[in-house]
Amino acid sequence: MRRSVAQCSEMLCSEVRDFNEVYQMSETSKKLIVTIPARLAATRLPNKPLADIHGRPMIVHVWERVVAAVGSADQVIVAAGDTEIVDVMQSVGGRVVLTDPDLPSGSDRVFSALLEIEKQDGVALEHVINVQGDLPTLPPELIEKTVSLLQDGSDMSSLVAEITDSSEIGNPNVVKAIVSWDEAASDSSKVGRALYFTRATAPSGDGPYYHHIGIYGYQRAALDRFVTLPPSPLEKREKLEQLRALEAGMTIGVPFRI
């Protein structure tokens, strides 16, 4: 049975416990950092990271979810594009790096923060998770799935979920993912390869539609390469940074079910 993101969040407490048991024993965790890029100059909703949700800014809710998932505040970094976000995160004891507000994408912001953290901590990180700053109800299990796909060798990893609300199919604010699935595998182990992401209704014909969830994993070498590439034509046209990776021939793995 497929679960929506909202349904997943109802199981948060048990998932945090289960994920921490796996994560804290993992060798991958020693070489991994989770970064949350955030800036105030959003096109559709300016100042979104500071939007009040039950008395606290959205970015704080996201940060708390991620810290609960990985079990270590030291491995969670907010890559801020504005001093206002820095002030908020410092007030709650979060690690935060001020980055250039003119960087072209969240991934570029993540990379900038990564370099600073490696310098501060004296470590060389191998895996990077990018959690978008507008996911205040993020289920912790989704971070685990993103990490596991990196261990399978994809350049990048991300998540999709089947669209169950028909009104989302034609909504340009709901990014659709076109995925090639390994049909020979069982549903529990099936891994897909992202072919394209679009704000349009795609693909045509009968069959399910999938919406993209704003979390990415990167092999360090893949992120290094990504940030050396200029914003691609399709990235600029769709306003979707992951298209830069696809146009450059990089692979983005996605799990079949979340």
Please place each PLM-identified region on the residue numbering.
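N-terminal glycine-rich phosphate-binding loop and ensuing alpha1 helix
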Residues: E27-A80
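Donor nucleotide-sugar recognition loop
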Residues: P230-L240
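Low-complexity, intrinsically disordered or signal/transmembrane-proximal segments
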Residues: Q7, Y23-Q24
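Catalytic donor-sugar/metal-binding loop of nucleotide-sugar-dependent glycosyltransferases
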Residues: A221, Q242-I258
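Conserved core of the sugar-phosphate nucleotidyltransferase
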Residues: L138-S232
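Short phosphate-binding loop-to-helix
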Residues: I77, T83-V131, L135-K145
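Short aromatic/basic micro-patch
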Residues: R44, T137, G217, K239
